[in-house]
Swiss-Prot record:
Positions annotated to bind UMP: 66, 127-134
Locations listed in the record: Cytoplasm
Family: Belongs to the UMP kinase family.
Enzyme class: transferase
Region (Involved in allosteric activation by GTP): 14-19
Family matches, as CDD domains: AAK_UMPK-PyrH-Ec (cd04254)
EC number, as in UniProt: 2.7.4.22
Domain of life: Bacteria
Name used for this protein in its record: Uridylate kinase
Pfam families: AA_kinase
GO biological process: 'de novo' CTP biosynthetic process; UDP biosynthetic process
UniProt binding sites for ATP: 6-9, 49, 53, 154, 160, 163
Subunit structure: Homohexamer.
Length: 231
């Protein structure tokens, strides 16, 4: 089974942190390694919130601020590749925005070859264009690696009808469609990512990635998190 895991940059630094937290990064490696050992084919899209905050770039023109964010995802991807390989895993980085020794251009034959080798695919540089989020990039790259599942790795155990941090009476919604999520105004993903999921028939699973073992449970179809399906 092929799956694309969407990680926030904050996953690498810890909440409110900057840069890289070795303990958090080792946790990520172990969770991904467990999935690889069970035979799952893994792709990753990572954000850059551990390196750049939106508020820090607010005085720049939007296109240039987005370019800085895209480059941040490349930095995170190179970091992850090194850590994965030091842990005995194979990993390859694909991007359309840079030419670095460790970064390959997106090539479908190369992607298939890497998956046969059980390499982790790390997709850097978002969609390569400004104005698109890493959520949209995750769906696009899932399609390119022929995965029909995107796991959004968050610190919340699923989708709620309102923010559970602000509202103690928030109710978890274990299963819903993209149309329902959009109608309810739920911020699971941005509208462009939702639309692409609907068009491509890709399912999104929202989990609390930082509950040990939850990723593997989600991949095995166990009842964790929330599942958002095409209509």
């Amino acid at each position: 089974m092929r799956v694309l895991v969407k990680l926030s940059g904050e996953a690498l630094s810890g909440e409110g942190g900057r840069g890289f937290d070795p303990e958090r990064v080792n946790y990520i490696v172990n969770e991904i390694k467990s999935a690889i050992e069970e035979g799952f084919k893994i792709g990753i899209v990572v954000g850059a919130g551990n390196l750049f905050r939106g508020v820090e770039l607010k005085n720049l023109t939007m296109t240039r601020a987005d370019q800085i964010g895209l480059l941040g995802t490349v930095m995170n991807s190179v970091y992850l590749k090194d850590i994965f390989e030091r842990s005995g895993l194979k990993a390859r980085i694909y991007s359309q925005i840079v030419n670095l020794p460790d970064v390959e251009r997106v090539n479908y034959d190369s992607i298939e070859s890497a998956l046969r080798e059980n390499s982790i695919l790390i997709f850097a540089g978002g969609t390569s264009n400004p104005f698109f989020t890493t959520d949209t990039a995750a769906v696009l790259r899932a399609q390119e690696m022929r995965a029909k599942l995107v796991v959004k790795a968050t610190k919340v155990d699923g989708v709620y009808d309102k923010d559970p941090k602000k509202f103690p009476d928030a109710k978890k919604i274990p299963h819903l469609t993209f149309s329902e999520a959009m109608k309810m105004g739920l911020k699971v993903m941005d509208a462009e990512a939702f639309a692409l999921c609907k068009k491509l028939g890709i399912t999104v699973k929202v989990i609390n990635f930082f509950e040990p073992g939850t990723l593997l449970k989600a991949l095995k179809g166990e009842d964790v998190g929330s599942t958002v399906v095409p209509d």
